[in-house]
Structures are given as structure tokens and as C-alpha cells.
């Protein structure tokens, strides 16, 4: 009795999975980048800590709502295309944050970032599910998801270190 050769994953698919993992990293890093900088934002914009924390809350709310729309959009326009556009949108939001002169402008930038970041994880997982053979799906989903786990830690670490060493704007420049 002969065994069927296992389905293999092409180099192009593996490269795409690596890029998607970087995208999921960016999504979670964008979400957590402000955690450690809240006291500095409170000081710079001369507002209370609760008001400065809106940069985290507004991002999370926008992120959660926006995710609902990306599945159908990815099905209609193509997952990778939507991921690419969303990543660029997140970068634009980060760039707006770098040049924010008021808390309101920073809040607007965080909404832009969230609108982009919200697409990255669900569409990356969907793309992997469509592109990878069933017998290797769990491993590839884990590799893709590893990016988001690392992004949680990386975002908090980068936000704190860059804010302390260079200033809060550099944390957003890092996300660009």
C-alpha cells in the first residue's frame, strides 16, 4: 500500500503567510502602542488620564465594529487586496498621529488606525484558510496568529520605550 504525498505549501504561499503574520503583528501593535504612553499624552495635551485614555478606548471600539464589515468586503474585493489597502490606511493613521497637535487630532488618527488595523487579523486568517491544504492548516494559522501575539507585547514595549527615549510621536512613527 502506498501513501499519498502530503500536500505541500509553495514558497509564494509561505512568503505570503510571513507577510500576513507581520500584518497581524502590526494590527495588535497598533492597538497596544498607546498603553504605556498615556501619562505622557495626559501631560502633553494637559488633560486628565481618563481623557487621554480615549486614544485606547476609541481605537478598541472602532476596531471591533469595523471587523464586522471586512469579511464581506474581503470576499467581494479579494482578501489580499483589502489587507493591503487596510495596512496602508493604518499607516496613514499613524502618520496623522505623528503630526497631531491636539488630543482631538490624535483621536481622529487613532480611528483611522483602527479602521485599517481591524481588517488585518480576520482577513489574514481567512486567506490562510483558503490557501493552505487542510492537513497543514493548523500549523499555518498558528504561524500567522503568532504575529498578533507578538504584536501585543511588541506594541506595548515599543510604545513605552520610544515614548521614554524619543517622545510619543516616535512610537507612531515606528508604526508607519
Regions found by a protein language model. Name each.
Residues 1-23:
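Cytosolic juxtamembrane N-terminal segment immediately preceding the first transmembrane helix
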Residues 15-49, 67-70:
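Extracytoplasmic
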Residues 65-101:
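Conserved MFS/SLC helix-loop-helix module at the cytosolic interface between two early adjacent transmembrane helices
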Residues 105, 143-176:
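Helix-loop-helix hairpin linking two adjacent transmembrane segments in secondary transporters
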Residues 109-148:
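Cytoplasmic helix-loop-helix junction between adjacent transmembrane helices
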